[in-house]
């Protein structure tokens, strides 16, 4: 089932807000008719924890990572995150992944930055193959 993002969405870096302020912001977007809130990942809050919190404070707004860094979590963890948020907020979560930027991966995170396309492909294949023993969400 495809997630409906709506006609208008907002990309917002919310790390300057407290969690309750971010929830109020998300609720305002929802009330104003926005379809989606895209949340990036850099060196601040964990976007997935924040999305879980925001989803609990909204009813219809779709949340998407824009983007989450594949170097921050292994494939099994990302699969579990995707399944968990898809269960918590059915039809309201989009997992946007990326390879980030070389300096963030090598200098900030301490990983080797390899060929982006083949690295992403391998990560997605590993996610697909990863073990997940939790209850499957109704929409994924």
Model-predicted regions and their roles:
Residues 1-63:
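N-terminal beta1-alpha1-beta2 module of alpha/beta enzyme domains
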Residues 2, 77-140:
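Internal, glycine-rich beta/alpha segment that forms the wall or movable "lid"
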Residues 13-15, 42, 68-70, 98-102:
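Active-site beta-loop-alpha junctions enriched in small/polar residues
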Residues 17, 72-76, 115:
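Residue-level signal for the nucleotide or nucleotide-sugar donor/cofactor binding architecture
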Residues 19, 37, 68, 110-113:
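Active-site oxyanion-binding pockets that recognize sulfate/phosphate
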Residues 22, 44-47, 71, 78, ...:
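Generic structural signal for well-ordered secondary structure
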Residues 38, 62-66, 86, 94-96:
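Short, conserved beta-strand segments within well-ordered enzyme catalytic domains
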Residues 48-68, 72, 119-129:
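Alpha-helix-loop-beta-strand connector modules within alpha/beta enzyme cores
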